[in-house]
């Protein structure tokens, strides 16, 4: 798979960085650099925790799944041919199960997300900026789950937490 013009790398050449870049792009597009890095740091904190999956892609795509109606209607279909999709509102990161395309448009925001992801995976660049946070939400929402969390603080357009 070749790298598209305007992309620094693709999902084949750098899969973990690509997953992280997608999450940065869809979760913090329009935020400042610190906000994007903090969103990325939450993923890295989860990878380091025994409570979450062990890779960036597994953390980003952690969800509850259901079989697609397209394959569910065929009882004799081999398991390897069945299609599963994430259940809406049952993903760790909302963009992954919103039903929209997960292909980012090529542009400055995507290139910045790819740069941040690459640097955070391959160096100590801004690692720790979220101060150990494993959860966050946008400033304009107030989810029920945050009542059970310890507030870390606000960075950019998100509020960060760690489990008590």
Task: List where the protein language model places each region.
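Bacterial extracytoplasmic/cell-wall-associated proteins, especially those involved in peptidoglycan
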Residues: 2-164
């Amino acid at each position: 798979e070749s790298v598209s013009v305007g992309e620094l790398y693709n999902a084949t050449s750098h899969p973990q960085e690509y997953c992280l870049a997608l999450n940065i792009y869809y979760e913090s597009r329009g935020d400042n650099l610190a906000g994007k890095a903090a969103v990325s740091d939450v993923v890295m904190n989860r990878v380091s925790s025994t409570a979450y999956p062990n890779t960036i892609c597994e953390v980003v795509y952690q969800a509850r799944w259901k079989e697609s109606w397209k394959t569910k209607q065929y009882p004799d279909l081999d398991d390897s041919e069945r299609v599963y999709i994430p259940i809406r509102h049952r993903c760790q990161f909302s963009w992954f199960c919103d039903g929209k395309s997960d292909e980012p448009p090529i542009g400055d925001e995507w290139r910045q997300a790819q740069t941040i992801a690459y640097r955070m995976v391959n160096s100590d660049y801004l690692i720790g900026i979220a101060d150990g946070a494993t959860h966050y939400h946008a400033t304009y929402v107030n989810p029920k789950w945050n009542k059970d969390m310890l507030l870390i603080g606000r960075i950019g357009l998100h509020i960060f937490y760690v489990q008590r």
